[in-house]
Amino acid sequence: MLKNQDLDIERKQEHIEINLTKNIESTLKSGFESIQFIHNALPEINYDNIDTTTTFLGKALQAPILISSMTGGTARARDINYRLAEAAQKAGIAMGLGSMRVLLAAADTIKTFAVRHIAPDILLLANIGAVQLNYGVTPKECQYLVDATKADALILHLNVLQELTQPEGNRNWANLLPKIREVINYLSVPVIVKEVGYGLSKQVAKSLIDVGVKTLDIAGSGGTSWSQVEAYRAKNSLQNRIASSFINWGIPTLDSLKMVREISKNVSIIASGGLKSGIDGAKAIRMGANIFGLAGQLLKAVDNSEYLVSEEIQLIIKQLKITMLCTGSRTLKDLTKAEIKL
């Protein structure tokens, strides 16, 4: 029988392959397609003076972009993370690491997550599933993940539906809020709570804010459907049918963004889930996000070369800057007031 860490590594290998080769898109849309910017034909701004810089979690970013968490723990994942880190360093944007539970069981997997030597200046986010706090992971171990990778913050991801569509997934989701509070109080860095593609509701966001969470990654539906990923991993027809039945589950990203921003003007929001371009990112900023995250198209590019992922990031940044010029927005603050049609 495979040990837990071997199962983790096998699952990560399968996840990469499925994400690269299968259609695992949610049937729901992110919602950003319903927003239209009002074109400004005379912006009276020099394109070269467009300013996409921002500060997030105390780090300066050249653009409000996060390479969302993808992978780790395998040789292929190491290559992917190294290329992503190099691209993030070049562009001056943030990067999230994939789930790091395997590192707590297999110390040698650190080489697949350790990218700080490649990207000394980026905002780097360590990552582990929040549910692992119910399965023995301690605040001290969470701090270890941060220290081992020299990360600037820790993501606790919420992946309840994904876990329940895995035959080996974790089932106990009770009493996590007090444990999340403990991690927040223990860690030397900020804690981000993130969904993985089904969105954060108003009620969940309020509960998290009430225990001290100051940064949320809403990760709504409209992009990768992890139940579809698990459907491809299913070992029998029953598992496949259970996972496949949730392809249209979740809160579209735009709806989640509106819900969370409605209950708090102060919480920092990362908008991710189904964003495909810098235009979508601009819409997310306009609707209240501080920064936006992308993963799917970057994974497909980075599996081939660092050059291709850097090119994809430059495309996204140029789309954002052109959108800003064509809405008369010289800065990201200006963009939050751009005229739109819903």
Swiss-Prot record:
Reaction it catalyzes: isopentenyl diphosphate = dimethylallyl diphosphate
Signal peptide bounds: none
Gene Ontology biological-process annotations: isoprenoid biosynthetic process
Co-factor(s): FMN; NADPH; Mg(2+)
Organism: Rickettsia canadensis (strain McKiel)
Pfam families per UniProt: FMN_dh (PF01070)
One MF term in the entry's GO annotations: oxidoreductase activity
CDD domains hit by this protein: IDI-2_FMN
Binding site for substrate: R11, K12, S99, M100, R101, Q162
Function: Involved in the biosynthesis of isoprenoids. Catalyzes the 1,3-allylic rearrangement of the homoallylic substrate isopentenyl (IPP) to its allylic isomer, dimethylallyl diphosphate (DMAPP).
Keywords: Cytoplasm, Flavoprotein, FMN, Isomerase, Isoprene biosynthesis, Magnesium, Metal-binding, NADP
EC number in record: 5.3.3.2
Class of enzymatic activity (EC top level): isomerase
Magnesium found in the keyword field: yes
Gene label: fni
Phosphoprotein is among the record's keywords: no
UniProt family annotation: Belongs to the IPP isomerase type 2 family.
Binding site for FMN: S68, S69, M70, T71, S99, N127, K194, T224, G274, L275, K276, A295, G296
Residues at which Mg(2+) binds: E163
Subunit structure: Homooctamer. Dimer of tetramers.
Gene Ontology CC terms: cytoplasm
Protein's recorded name: Isopentenyl-diphosphate delta-isomerase
Localization, UniProt: Cytoplasm
